[in-house]
């Protein structure tokens, strides 16, 4: 994407799929509304059904990762704006996910309705924001913890705006944070 005030830094421990460079994230593409990049932490349990439906509709996949399913769902949507396309795509997937979707001027952050994977927002000293699955990432850039993204919530950051917008996409379910987050995946200095 062109130079802007937003960026993606992503390091994911793959628990499913291949370790091929084709399955590295972010996944980026040009589509009818412009350019987007997506990173995803989690697993979609209906990924095979969604992929088969997309292939039947003419989608061509470049990887084996379930993140690409989300990209195709967004790209094929007929909704007028990216936010509505993301919402429509999320209504078709089932599983554990934290997503960050970056366009030219907006960044969308979404957490699944069960809150299976952690996702937090931090504030940089210059007023900018950082989003990470582990709060120890904030320490590395001098950011302070603001809050967690709630289960079922979408956060929208817009270039040039100092505040972010919160949208309750899905009613939060009984929280089901993955036990492995704190005993295996996460660093001990993360909240």
Whereabouts are the PLM-identified features?
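Conserved short alpha-helical segments that host acidic/polar catalytic motifs at enzyme active sites
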Residues: 1-151, 156-191
